[in-house]
């Protein structure tokens, strides 16, 4: 049986490849996301991207943050072999908007901001407000779970090497 720490470090590349693939999907192919959420409007790179290049003797870390920050430095880092370790995502569905950061090494979600809900005007309304908040949290989590499940199936298929990986490389080189 694998030690948890060994397994964690051995497979963290999957989460980082997932985030890199997700950025590619955000830039080039958002239409297929509608199959996971019929009300899907958009998925955008938010206000923070962290990339890391571990191919040299020392790890190089690049952080791009701020509203309206240019992502060209991130593309340049991808060209040099970096992988995304954190990605802030803006998810829009119907008239609703979520924003959160996804960490590659563990796929932890942090700073999840959900759409605002109605306030409870009486004690009877509290249960409805709580259930609405649970639904809104779950909707963002379900999207990430479905995207990751799709990614893992794609990653172990022949399509990854024959089609998807070359498309990602082409996107990185042409940006």
Task: Provide a role label for each language-model segment.
Residues 1-175:
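Intrinsically disordered, low-complexity, charge-rich terminal extensions
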